[in-house]
């Protein structure tokens, strides 16, 4: 991606310090390449790629874009723009051997290499019509299906037919699930539409439920062994310690947030900003 030197210099001066406990600093600012606007691509979710790249997913236009130093600008999907297309892509993730795309309507996982070349695909049986997914650092994928109100485990290109977590067993877990995430230890976090966060072990054992105390939480973000919630206005809070964070205004409006180690990547309308998080 191209970077604006003047923007970067000014953004490095922006620091958010809250309660002398956590520090957010803007480490990088990456404006979208011009091809994004030329092709009228509007990514609404994204994921860290490899070698400093990012994967941008436009769920409306069914388009996946890779931007960064590894491949420059590359795209796959869309309506008639490429040899291969998606029906309803709802999630993109990076595995040790490539990129995974979860297609809800087709009930399948599509595998691409890091240059977005098609490799293979796996059909999901039973037909989950998946809504959300998350992947851990070992390549285990966890898929939420509202049809079953359950989380399924997908490993080594095989879907376990028995739910990893049957949410129907928990009366305190709402049927409306907003986010599903996995942390560095493989533990699962669920953000419900009612602002409650539910935590499970990597084996699917229930740990605890915690009420979020920020208005309209939209994003659930694991950073190391801590869990945070953020809303679209950039207000954030660690759900256990209740320490607040504020995303700098330059990163607003927020369309998606993803973490890697101690860094946050913020997807906005025309750029990605990267924040370093210092935990004291």
Q: Which ranges hold each PLM region?
A:
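A short helix->beta-strand "capping" segment at the edge of beta-propeller domains
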Residues: 21-42
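Surface loop/turn motifs at the tips and blade-to-blade linkers of beta-strand repeat domains
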Residues: 35-39, 78-84, 122-126, 165-173, ...
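Beta-strand-rich domains and repeat architectures in extracellular enzymes and scaffolds
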Residues: 35-62
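Repeated scaffold domains used in trafficking and secretory/extracellular systems
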Residues: 41-47, 86-92, 128-135, 173-181, ...
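Conserved beta-strand positions in repeat-built beta-propeller and related beta-rich domains
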Residues: 49, 56-60, 101-106, 143-149, ...
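Short coil/turn segments that connect the beta-strands within blades of beta-propeller domains
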Residues: 51-52, 96-97, 138-139, 185-187, ...
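Short loop/turn segments that connect beta-strands within beta-propeller blades
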Residues: 68-71, 113-116, 155-158, 201-203, ...
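Blade-level signature of beta-propeller repeat domains, shared across WD40, Kelch, NHL, RCC1
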Residues: 252-280
């Amino acid at each position: 991606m191209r970077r604006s030197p003047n923007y970067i210099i000014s953004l490095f001066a922006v620091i958010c310090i809250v309660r002398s406990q956590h520090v957010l600093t803007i480490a990088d600012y990456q404006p979208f390449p011009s091809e994004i606007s030329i092709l009228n691509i509007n990514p609404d979710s994204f994921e860290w790629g490899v070698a400093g790249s990012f994967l941008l997913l436009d769920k409306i236009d069914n388009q996946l874009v890779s931007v960064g130093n590894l491949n420059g600008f590359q795209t796959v999907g869309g309506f008639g723009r490429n040899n291969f297309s998606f029906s309803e892509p709802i999630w993109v993730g990076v595995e040790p051997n490539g990129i995974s795309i979860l297609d809800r309507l087709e009930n399948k996982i599509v595998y691409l290499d890091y240059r977005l070349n098609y490799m293979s695909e796996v059909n999901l049986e039973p037909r989950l019509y998946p809504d959300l997914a998350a992947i851990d650092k070992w390549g285990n994928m966890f898929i939420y299906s509202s049809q079953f109100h359950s989380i399924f485990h997908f490993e080594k290109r095989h879907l376990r037919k028995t739910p990893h977590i049957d949410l129907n067993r928990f009366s305190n877990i709402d049927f409306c699930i907003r986010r599903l995430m996995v942390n560095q230890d493989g533990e699962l976090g669920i953000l419900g539409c009612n602002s409650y966060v539910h935590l499970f072990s990597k084996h699917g054992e229930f740990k605890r439920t915690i009420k979020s105390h920020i208005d309209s939480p939209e994003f659930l973000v694991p950073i190391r062994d801590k869990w945070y919630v953020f809303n679209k206005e950039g207000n954030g809070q660690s759900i256990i310690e209740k320490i607040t964070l504020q995303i700098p205004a330059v990163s607003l409006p927020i369309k998606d947030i993803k973490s890697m180690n101690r860094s946050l990547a913020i997807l906005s309308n025309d750029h990605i900003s990267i924040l370093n998080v210092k935990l004291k």
